[in-house]
Regions:
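Exposed, low-structure sequence patches enriched in small/polar residues
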Residues: 3-259
């Protein structure tokens, strides 16, 4: 009788093995810089005098929108006793459109950019001892071809002297194309075209030691930045040829007695 009662409480639970994913992301931005009665010689350059507002008045309108479609296939973590991690493979197509005043100030000039990227993600979130999340994405076709993003983080947790110790690490490496408005901009008083900018290289390595009971934390990180793109004081685009290093250190200790 007891065996029959136990069997009656058993139930089958469906655990999905694979997910097919599609995401659509749309963004639209519009910016207007409007000014009247600009002081004489206030701006160094004037590229057109006509437009919506002529003379010394300014009406610079910039538009930008992008449409991004991502398709992914995911093998879910835990669907099989031998599958200790989840795996996702994805591909993305992005369309970007930009619109700014043309050289007459009356019409408008537009630019279109397409990009195709592929990537993968490996992650483990279940369990209490080990977790990790690794992701890689590279751009194959388009304006940003050659871009690369590598991200990784992991943590190990274990008990020590009535406390829980966590050792965590995080790192990333990015090779990124400077964004559109570093490369092109058109307005009544500011205008530039920079098609030969180098890709920025960003590297980050971080280690974290923490104790749960005493809320003690020590974090050390190193950042390296190469080919940094920036504006000079006169709005000329520059690319730094030197490496920039940052080493932040955080020590956080809160100790209290448990009665």
């Amino acid at each position: 009788k007891k065996s029959a009662e136990d069997t009656a409480w058993l139930k089958n639970e469906y655990v999905p093995v694979t997910s097919f994913i599609h995401t659509l992301d749309f963004n639209y931005h519009s910016r207007i810089y409007e000014a009247y009665q600009s002081p004489t010689n206030y701006y160094t350059n004037t590229y057109f005098t006509d437009g919506v507002l002529a003379g010394d008045s300014i009406y610079d309108k910039t538009k930008y929108y992008n449409i991004k479609n991502t398709f992914a296939i995911a093998l879910l973590e835990g669907f099989n006793k031998y599958a200790k991690a989840g795996l996702k493979i994805f591909g993305t197509h992005e369309y970007r459109n930009f619109s700014m005043p043309d050289s007459t100030g009356i019409g408008r000039q537009s630019w279109s950019e397409h990009n195709i990227s592929v990537g993968a993600q490996l992650n483990k979130t279940q369990g209490s001892m080990l977790h990790y999340n690794l992701m890689a994405e590279t751009w194959l076709v388009g304006e940003d071809a050659g871009q690369l993003k590598l991200d990784g983080r992991a943590d190990v947790n274990f008990h020590l002297f009535n406390d829980t110790v966590q050792l965590a690490a995080k790192a990333f490496f990015y090779r990124l194309n400077p964004t559109f408005f570093y490369r092109h901009y058109q307005s009544k008083h500011f205008w530039w075209d920079n098609d030969g900018l180098d890709k920025e290289l960003r590297t980050h390595i971080e280690g974290d030691f923490s104790l749960k009971r005493t809320r003690t934390r020590l974090r050390v990180a190193v950042d390296n930045l190469q080919n940094y793109t920036y504006f000079s004081i006169n709005l000329v685009i520059h690319t730094s040829i030197n490496s920039l290093f940052f080493i932040p250190i955080l020590v956080h200790i809160i100790y209290f007695l448990l009665c």
